[in-house]
Amino acid sequence: MPTQRLFTGGDHRFLQALRRELGAAVETRLAVAFVLQSGVDLLAPTLRAALLRPGQHVRILTTDYLGVTEPEALEALLALPAVNGAKLELRAYEARGHSFHPKAYLFRHASGARRAFVGSSNLSATALQHGVEWNWSSLEPADGEVLLDAEMTDLL
């Protein structure tokens, strides 16, 4: 995959890129406003395989903002088995009337390289497969300037 790329839906499917990164990463951080069962179903096999790898760490931050996130989707994520020191953390931002609407997918590889996708896709089948969504991908090499830390690390 190129160092930078825009995924716009149509022939540029975001789901395949997410599966590829999740399948290779040692650490995954997602911040998505809405988590739907349809999106969890699409990523569950890849997440399940990732959580079988020793030391894998998956963090997902979502919200109760607007009541869109589906409780059954969160339950399905928490039900995924993790072994060999792997773990899945799930956090929910309590909106309390404030907007919480990020869509960021961050991956760190064993080499130290990091890939970030930032855009408009929530964790839903429509957003990941065929919706009109824009998601920008950027690869930061292991020896590159660390751009993905600071606020993202604090948030996720």
Where are these regions (language model features)?
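PLD/PLD-like phosphodiesterase catalytic module centered on the HKD motif
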Residues: 1-156
